[in-house]
């Protein structure tokens, strides 16, 4: 009996010792020696649920928000004592209860008392979101952490605001593309027909879909917005409580759905949702959290890891991969309290955070317990297998790529297994509806200690261009999408904490490095017609009122237009002869490298409203099967010029275009593509053109630019109309014929003979005068200079 008591005492003494070695606790207490921290000012925020939340900024690793009985905001990972987070009383929030929070770039969005408030932590300022007219309880969004990408800025700025639990057919949903500053009503397709309550609405960028969680009769399922997933719901799953949905960072499509008695996992943005299993080694102990009778208090999620702390004072850990997710239980530890929360500091390093109230100061201290996951996994009682991966890397990690229309991408990864083991690599794309790939895995030499090195070559392009999928599977080719590429190892052991999956974000959309340039081999300056120095010296020209319309409708203006020529923007104009059918040679450039001559469809518009040019083809001669678009109709439809682009262009050769061909003789104003349409000029002078590539299948970019030409060689404009000129010519001919007929008859009369006699005498006199002047000129040429005979025989000096 004495021996048993001694063993029990030793066991109880060793247990906290082991716990201390695995989880080293320390208390953060700062700013209290000299009482530097001020009192709490404003309305103190709080979070009502019995569980806690700790939201880390996905990109700024030191910024986080703690939600519990008190709310704390930190910019240094809780390394200083903090006052409870408050909102200024001037905001007049009413009940300062926080129901949802989200980081949108450098902004913190908080739903307080069913309204959305914005805290700009960089400028320490508060504001209220505009445009929300109805109560909301939650906000949702995502963050993209690739720096220097406009696409990432767009991702971070998109936010939804909604009332969770409302009937979908009657609820109001709001969206923002300004990071939460302004919201607009969001109209989900056929929303009024959806039966069920709203569990949330999210923009899954990994799938390029807006997804709505529909809850009905104890089942949840995601409904998607766009083809091809909008034809049906995702697979249903048990919805036994109000689930919080966490989108794992990295845009890989990983979701965690949880409440106190349930933990669900999806690796494809909600299309398939499964329970998280509880395992010990390779053995599955429980198929779900509910079956294991676990009560979750808080969870922490990164791109690849998951940690769970329960009210039963247990800590669980798992990794997030393509296989069904599972967690393992670590040794029992005294770590739980009603205020405890979890957060990952780095891969394999977990921090257990507990706010500590100070009776003497208003600022709270923080107890931090740092857990080394790798050390815990080495416990032989966990039966965790040894990691079989020695090395896994790729040059594409931490980078973002773009695949434009008809483009392709090649990436490589390197892999070295542990000696005596073999591995199977997994290559996955989060959006197979828009991005396809082909991978090759092969040996690539040996390491210095004899291990085999392997290389993985991945060739990617748009799924539609592989030619091996049905149109019912692929997304719309006209729509820009995105996908995440992930390289991982099949059946990877949970002990591979430091071997993270290789992941990169691929935008199937506009390559921002692309631009169009108009070929200008023969310019007005190189041919000597215009002087570049003159063009640079505030040069201007006049467009006569007969040849331009400021409204771009082809109507004459009331006054001439004085135009300044921007040489810095336009350079020397391209030279065009008026009597030649013409169209520009459009070149595609990427950065400073020429790519190709563009043969896609495009449109031109003279930016000053000139209309003294026409097109060589009509709708009929261009073989249109439907009425073609033109600048007149597009300007009327969109309220101004320069809005004709790939987004609104509809080809008159498209068999799906049902617009009847009512006016076949109208000018066909689209150049390039399948037609030989060209431009005809009838007037000399400067033309400054706006060009836009409208072919939706050439590039996802809005390729546009302006350029100038100089037309020469046209005849001067007639001041008298052609009808008047023709009338005068005909009158002259008729008058000549009449005189030829009438004159002979007139000469036979007495009056005619007198006229004839006078004319004869006049001719003789003119002949005599001419002979005299000719002889005088001849004599003057034979005498010495300065002297000639006078008519009277004398001499005259000059």
Curated annotation (Swiss-Prot):
It holds the Pfam family CATSPERD-E_C. Residues 21-723 are extracellular. GO terms for biological process: flagellated sperm motility; sperm capacitation; spermatogenesis. GO terms for cellular component: CatSper complex; plasma membrane; sperm principal piece. The keyword Transmembrane helix applies. Glycans are attached at residues 123, 230, 240, 472, 538, 630. The keyword Iron-sulfur does not apply. It comes from the Eukaryota. Residues 746-798 are cytoplasmic. It is found in: Cell projection, Cilium, Flagellum membrane. The chain crosses the membrane at residues 724-745. Keywords: Cell membrane, Cell projection, Cilium, Developmental protein, Differentiation, Disulfide bond, Flagellum, Glycoprotein, Membrane, Signal, Spermatogenesis, Transmembrane, Transmembrane helix. It is a single-pass type I membrane protein. Disulfide bonds join 23-369, 59-145, 144-152, 387-496, 510-701, 525-572, 624-652. Residues 1-20 form the signal peptide. InterPro entries: CATSPERD/E (IPR028751), CATSPERD/E_C (IPR053814), CATSPERD_b-prop (IPR053813), Ig-like_CATSPERD (IPR055451). Its main location: membrane. Belongs to the CATSPERD family. Auxiliary component of the CatSper complex, a complex involved in sperm cell hyperactivation. Sperm cell hyperactivation is needed for sperm motility which is essential late in the preparation of sperm for fertilization. Required for CATSPER1 stability before intraflagellar transport and/or incorporation of the CatSper complex channel into the flagellar membrane. Component of the CatSper complex or CatSpermasome composed of the core pore-forming members CATSPER1, CATSPER2, CATSPER3 and CATSPER4 as well as auxiliary members CATSPERB, CATSPERG, CATSPERD, CATSPERE, CATSPERZ, C2CD6/CATSPERT, TMEM249, TMEM262 and EFCAB9. HSPA1 may be an additional auxiliary complex member. The core complex members CATSPER1, CATSPER2, CATSPER3 and CATSPER4 form a heterotetrameric channel. This is Cation channel sperm-associated auxiliary subunit delta. It comes from Homo sapiens. The gene is CATSPERD.
């Amino acid at each position: 009996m004495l021996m048993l008591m001694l063993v029990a005492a030793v066991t109880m003494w060793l247990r906290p010792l082991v716990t201390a070695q695995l989880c080293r606790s320390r208390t953060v207490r700062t700013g209290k020696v000299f009482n530097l921290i001020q009192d709490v000012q404003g309305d103190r925020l709080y979070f009502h649920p019995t569980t806690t939340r700790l939201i880390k900024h996905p990109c700024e690793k030191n910024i986080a928000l703690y939600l519990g009985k008190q709310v704390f905001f930190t910019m240094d990972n809780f390394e200083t004592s903090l006052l409870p987070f408050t909102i200024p009383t001037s905001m007049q929030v009413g009940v300062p209860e926080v129901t949802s929070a989200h980081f949108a770039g450098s902004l913190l969005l908080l739903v307080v008392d069913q309204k959305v408030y914005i805290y700009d932590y960089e400028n320490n300022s508060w504001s209220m979101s505009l445009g929300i007219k109805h109560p909301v309880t939650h906000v949702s969004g995502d963050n993209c952490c690739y720096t220097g990408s406009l696409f990432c800025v767009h991702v971070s700025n998109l936010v939804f605001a909604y009332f969770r639990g409302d009937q979908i057919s009657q609820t109001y949903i709001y969206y923002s593309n300004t990071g939460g500053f302004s919201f607009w009503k969001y109209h989900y397709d056929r929303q009024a027909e959806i039966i069920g309550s709203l569990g949330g609405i999210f923009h899954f960028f990994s799938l390029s879909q807006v997804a709505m969680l529909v809850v009905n009769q104890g089942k949840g399922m995601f409904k998607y917005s766009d083809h091809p997933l909008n034809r049906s719901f995702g697979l249903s799953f048990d919805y036994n409580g109000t689930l919080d949905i966490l989108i794992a960072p990295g845009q890989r499509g990983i979701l965690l759905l949880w409440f106190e008695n349930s933990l669900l996992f999806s690796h494809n943005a909600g299309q398939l949702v499964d329970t998280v299993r509880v395992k010990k080694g390779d053995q599955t102990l429980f198929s779900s959290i509910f079956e294991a009778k676990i009560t979750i208090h808080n969870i922490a999620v990164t791109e690849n890891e998951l940690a769970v702390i329960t009210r039963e004072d247990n800590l669980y850990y798992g990794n997030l991969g393509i296989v069904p997710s599972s967690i393992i239980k670590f040794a029992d530890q005294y770590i739980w309290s009603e205020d405890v929360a979890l957060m990952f500091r780095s891969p394999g390093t977990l921090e257990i955070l507990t706010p500590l109230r100070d009776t003497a100061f208003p600022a709270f201290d923080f107890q931090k317990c740092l857990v080394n996951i790798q050390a815990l996994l080495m416990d032989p009682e966990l039966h965790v297998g040894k990691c079989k991966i020695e090395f896994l890397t790729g040059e594409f990690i931490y980078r973002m790529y773009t695949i434009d229309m008809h483009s392709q991408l090649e990436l490589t990864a390197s892999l070295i297994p542990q000696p005596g083991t073999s591995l199977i690599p997994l290559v996955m794309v989060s959006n197979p509806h828009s991005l396809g790939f082909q991978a090759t895995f092969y040996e690539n030499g040996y390491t210095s200690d004899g291990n085999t090195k392997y290389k993985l070559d991945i060739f990617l392009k748009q799924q539609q261009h592989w030619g091996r999928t049905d149109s019912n599977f692929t997304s719309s080719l006209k729509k820009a999408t995105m996908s995440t590429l992930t390289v991982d190892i099949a059946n990877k052991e949970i002990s591979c904490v430091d071997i993270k999956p290789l992941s990169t974000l691929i935008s199937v959309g506009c390559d921002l490095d692309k631009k169009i340039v108009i070929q200008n081999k023969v310019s007005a300056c190189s041919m000597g017609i215009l002087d570049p120095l003159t063009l640079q010296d505030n040069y201007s020209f006049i467009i006569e009122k007969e040849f331009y319309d400021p409204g771009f409708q082809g109507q004459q203006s009331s006054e001439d237009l004085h135009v300044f020529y921007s040489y810095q923007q336009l350079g020397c104009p391209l030279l065009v002869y008026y009597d030649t059918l013409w169209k520009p040679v459009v070149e595609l450039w990427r950065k400073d490298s020429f790519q190709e001559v563009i043969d896609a469809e495009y449109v031109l518009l003279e930016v000053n409203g000139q209309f003294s040019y026409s097109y060589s083809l009509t709708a009929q001669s261009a073989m249109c099967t439907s009425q073609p678009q033109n600048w007149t109709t597009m300007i009327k439809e969109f309220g101004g010029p320069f809005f004709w682009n790939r987004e609104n262009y509809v080809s008159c050769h498209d068999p799906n275009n049902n617009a009847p061909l009512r006016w076949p003789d109208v000018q066909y104003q689209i150049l390039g593509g399948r037609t030989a349409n060209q431009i005809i000029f009838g007037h000399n002078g400067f033309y400054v053109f706006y060009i836009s590539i409208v072919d939706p299948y050439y590039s996802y970019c809005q390729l546009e630019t302006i350029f100038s030409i100089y037309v020469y060689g046209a005849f001067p404009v007639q001041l008298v109309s052609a009808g008047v000129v023709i009338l005068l010519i005909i009158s002259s001919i008729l008058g000549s014929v009449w005189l030829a007929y009438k004159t002979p008859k007139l000469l036979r009369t007495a009056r005619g003979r007198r006229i004839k006699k006078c004319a004869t005498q006049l001719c003789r006199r003119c002949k005599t005068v001419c002979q005299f002047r000719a002889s005088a000129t001849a004599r003057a040429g034979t005498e010495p200079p300065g002297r000639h005979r006078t008519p009277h025989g004398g001499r005259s000096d000059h």
